Amino acid sequence: MDFEQYGQSSQQPRQRRRRAGKRRLNNKTPIAARLALDPQLRGKVGILSEDLANDLFQQQALQDVTTSDDGVLYVAIAPHTPTYTSVEDQAWTILPVRIQPTERSPVAMSHSTVLFPESADSLQPFLQALGKVDSSRNSLQAHRSVEIRILDVAPIHLDTIFVTVERHLLRNHDDVQTKFGGGFTNAQGPNGLWGKTGKSVEAKKYSKRAAADAEQRLTAAVREALGAQRIVHTGDVLPLPLPSHPITYAPPPPARISFCEPVSQGLLMSTTKIVLVQARPQGIRAQQTMPSRSALLKQVAEDEADDTSNEQFYSAAEDKPGESGTEMEVTSAAEESETEGSAGSMSDSSDDSLEDMISLSAPELPQPPSGVMSSLTSATPRAGGRRSDGIHTPGSVASNFTSATMRPGRGGGKTFKVEGLLQQVPNEVLHPRPRDDEDVDSFVFVDISTLAKIGCFSGDWVRIEAAEEPQLNMFASLKFGSFNDSPEDSGDWRPVKIFGLSGLPSSKPRYAINHSGERRPSISQRPPTRLTPSVFVPPLLLGNIENPKYLRISPMTFATPNGSSKPGILQHMKNTAAKNPPLAKEVTLLKVSTPLSMDRVLQPALFAGLKQYFESRRRILKSGDLVGISVDEGLGRAVFSGTGSGDSASQEEDITIRLGQGANATNAGTRKIGVAWFRVGQVAPTTVEELEETGEDQWGGVAVLDPATTRMVQAGSDVSRVPGVLGNGWEYWLGVKTIPKTVHDAPTPHGIVADPPQSVIPPLQQRIRDLMSAATSPRAIQLGMKPVFILLRSQQRHIGKATVATRACSDIGIHTFPIDAYDILTEGGANGGDVKTEAYLKARAERAFHCGANCTALLIRHIEVLTADRIVTAMSDILNDARVVIATTTDVETIPEGIRSLITHEFEMGAPEEKEREGILQNAVTERGIRLSADVDLGSIALKTAALVAGDLVDVVERAAGARTARLESLAEASKKISGSEVFVRDVLLAGGDGARGVTKADFDAAVEAARKNFADSIGAPKIPNVGWDDVGGLTNVKDALVETIQLPLERPELFAKGMKKRSGILFYGPPGTGKTLLAKAIATEFSLNFFSVKGPELLNMYIGESEANVRRVFQRARDARPCVVFFDELDSVAPKRGNQGDSGGVMDRIVSQLLAELDGMNGGEENSGGVFVIGATNRPDLLDTALLRPGRFDKMLYLGVSDTHRKQATILEALTRKFALHPDVSLDRVAEQLPLTYTGADLYALCSDAMLKAITRKATAVDEKINALPNGPVSTAWFFDHLATKEDVNVMVTEEDFLSAQGELVPSVSAKELEHFERIRQTFEAVDKSKQDPAAAAPQTIAEAMEAFSLGGSAIPEEAPTINGDSLTPGGIHGRIKGLNRWPGNPVRSTSGQSTTSSKGKGKSVSKKGKSRTGAESDGSVDGDDEDMADANSKEDEDEDDYVVRTDHLRNPMEEVE
């Protein structure tokens, strides 16, 4: 390195790296400095001036650097922007620097300067950031400095970096070196390597060994390139140390750093992982080589379309056939006509720019004029333009603009589309720069290219007035004769100062070339393009002119005393420069009555803010204007809660004013900011001589308020609405809300932020807004329409009822006066009961109506607690004076009937759906100004937050922001441990990256998990158990059936959207311990469903009606938590057969009836019926009410039995021992071979648990023996494990002997006889069709056919009937019964009552011992386990689940009589 010019010798000992301790300051603000390039410097380290070093680093740190090895410090620089607010808003670049040597420096550096070598490539990220801030400054030149902001920084160590290189880079490089290494020779021919045929020499093929060697060389080259970098930045282009082209000397394609973790820039360590990615080159210039390193900082971004190769250089007329049309960007005569300027306007000459004279269309012969097109000439505006009627084009057929109609000195102006500003534009970017005390609310901003079309200069006074939307149709505004006279000035205009800014987005026409050469048949087929430029207006000014969509801007003209105007641009410049609005002698202000401005506690803060507002700037106001004052409500209530006097009161006012004025900064979202509104009543100007002489007001009634001379009077209050937030961003302008920003947002050179965030508006909010707009409209008030009383009800708290109502009022500018019924009840109950409660309620309502009954909505929260009889009368009186009353409740049943009768509209707010949850999350993120990284998908987060309401979703967002802060702090602590220097969170933010700047997906996942864990009990959010298919051993056929039943409605909901029924009820039955509950949990986990587990006793309640209400609440919670699984364990205790219980009140029967009613709606095709799956588990399905088993309820019955093979038992053992440390000699197959086939899943679980317990006991015994055998005597077990225990003493391994020993002690939970009983129950409920029926011998399918068969003595079951569990459905093979009619005698059947019945004489008479038979559904009772010849089944099911066999066993023979 050559530092001799600045006094640093090459023999000077290198200084070691700085070790910063606690002396670093965490809250240091950036310092303004200048960055310059020096061609005489070498290396990649810059030089820092001495004054900057003293300002950035502490003295002790500088002393440590002087004795270090290399003396390298690290700073972060960013382009200077006037809109700086925080470190996160800038794109910082970390660079290595050294301090300027002072001993032998012949040339002194400039003050606050950073010098960098011209050949340094570490400035690439800074150049990119500089190009985004100012597109004209995307490169640096030597000895020309740029303004920057600089901070000291401690670099973060990188964990992983991804380096992208071109695919087959070394292979192509070797081929080039082989072909051109010796240059062009005669032996190769005159065409080089290409002969006369034009074919190149074939490249040699690479073997696998050559490819491996090439990969090693490439890895070494990348490592060498990275080793030369002190700081690695994402996006850096690294030149690879490979030979250049032998002939062109072009360097090989470089490597690019595509991604870094955990931050976007930092230090390389020995532990940093380097991931090499080989990608194909993209784009037209993908094969272009990297420019030389010396010219890297001088390059300018080139357009890819500017390629002048032979293949692409052709004119528009020579376009190749078959290609798509090329769009060209030209300026046409239509843009000239849009200026609407007259012949006397001095801005016409500026429109004749060179752009309008260039045409890129192919030369063609002119078409003969005919039809409509014959009327269009060169003077007619282009069709599709903004003003295409030709009125202002002299010579056109539609123009009446002639020399006789021209008015000198007055131009037509130009129409602009209005864009509202969200924050103030700094004065530093304006030219000419306005004074600091000028009113920023009277500034408008346009693109600098449109100033000439208006006819003014930047900083001039212009007049603005509302205009209509320009018509796209050229004949839309066509009029004839005298009807086309231009209207006179309406007088509703106001003067503003206009400033031109560069870099604003401008719309220009783009026309496609007509390649076909055919003539367009009509003008209407031309695509309409809107070319209206934009004007950026402050939101308060926009609200004072009634929020127009378009504005007409024209230059100000000043009349002389004799009434004639003075044309001429020079005179216009003199008048504009000399004229200013008149000063106001006296201004009257009216306080707009709002709940905030009427609060007595906030009055001192309100007037202190008003004083600060008018003293800080010379405000320009007009009679009727609205003025907004920001007030910090929290600080105002805290500071002015008591009475202050003297100096302390003035200090409190200063605190309130300054914090209120700073509300539009980044901390606006952390404080509650309110706005108080004042209306300008009367403005009296100081001088009226000019107005008397000219007879007109040349300034539109505006005047300047000078705080030194103007007398201000606050006279009374005004009742009116405030500006609505729809289409107006005054909340961001006044600091009520924070402007949302993304991770990759970069500051703009003009500082304009005009894109309002798109908030998601729920349909209920729109409905309430429409109702309030209609109720408060002047027409409704004039006609005396009844007021609107809206009730918002929900079953859960914090669902957002009051928030929706408040936002609906804010949308249309209506005041919201909240009243908490609990406060009313508390104050009234403490002072006299219902009478006082009524008086407090009326007093609060009367206070709200002071703000205007026609523009105030009364919001009563928790109205269900106002149950007194006197409240009904009070509410009726309140409604007589109000226009809008909104009440919220979570228990609508407790609201008195008198109040319910007054309600006109009632809306229910349920738990938000997935799309609604996504909208709530989006609004919460936007309002808090939280940056989201690219990997965050709010839709997936909404999917994981089922059953959470609006309050919980907002808490999730806040928890995610807190998780980001904790993550950054932990990253700083980890970097501190690695480097040994002090690292702050600010250093992580300076390093940048998505993870540092924004909230990541991992932060949201942690927030969702924490929210579910902390709020599950309070809000009833169901928990998803962590059980998967791997935890369920065996049951493969059951898993397949579940996937078919549940997965199809979840993945293809559109199939069921139009009424198609789906099977959402599943019943698991079988012996106890076979995994029914475990399988239900696995369903919820595998399909990402929420999980409810309902036990029978939870539904019972001693009060009448409450048990059924509990059933309704369970299913309502399940619908709110969709997609959800409701699991009824031991269903036979919840829904037994009706009529068999002995309870006097019939509670169980009512529970069953309510359960049946709820299950009917679960599988419907309605909009809100899907997404809930009901699963029941029982050991005794024969005890269930038969109505539960019909299709549409529990229509899918799955039997879960014991394993019938040892291989299935081994599969279950493998699932149970997944987390066990098994001995290598253990074979689970051998263990399973020794087990009986009567073991259930629970028995196998007990076997594994006992085996593990025996292994632990054996290990504990061995440790005790080892302790007792110690030479120095026994020690405590804890001391042994802390000091003497080895790895073998801690690890517990289960051996095969442990399993065998556990098996010897294990008693099966289900005996073989009980398993036979469950198998018979299974045969009762299941039937398998093993053979297809012959259509000719099919069983009777109608009731009439069955009755005829029975009456004729025939068989209702054919010979080739389907088999039931192996038994043929023949008189000799089935022991069944047909309810009330038994065809085969001698088969005892036990009835529901437990009595045995027999058939007599083969005629189907069913005789009971009690003299009565049980028929109908009750005859499907439980079967006796002791009867060997029991009836097997009453229901038959084919192999195809969709083919149903008609059951006729419930029919009776009408010819028989029951005895």
From Swiss-Prot:
Domain of life: Eukaryota
Matches recorded under CDD domains: RecA-like_PEX6_r2
Binding site for ATP: G1070, P1071, P1072, G1073, T1074, G1075, K1076, T1077
Compartment list: Cytoplasm, Cytosol; Peroxisome membrane
Keywords: ATP-binding, Cytoplasm, Hydrolase, Membrane, Nucleotide-binding, Peroxisome, Peroxisome biogenesis
Region feature Disordered, mapped onto this chain: 1-28, 316-410, 1357-1459
GO molecular function ontology, one term from the record: ATP hydrolysis activity
Record family assignment: Belongs to the AAA ATPase family.
Protein name: Peroxisomal ATPase PEX6
Organism (species): Penicillium chrysogenum
Lineage start: Eukaryota, Fungi, Dikarya, Ascomycota, Pezizomycotina
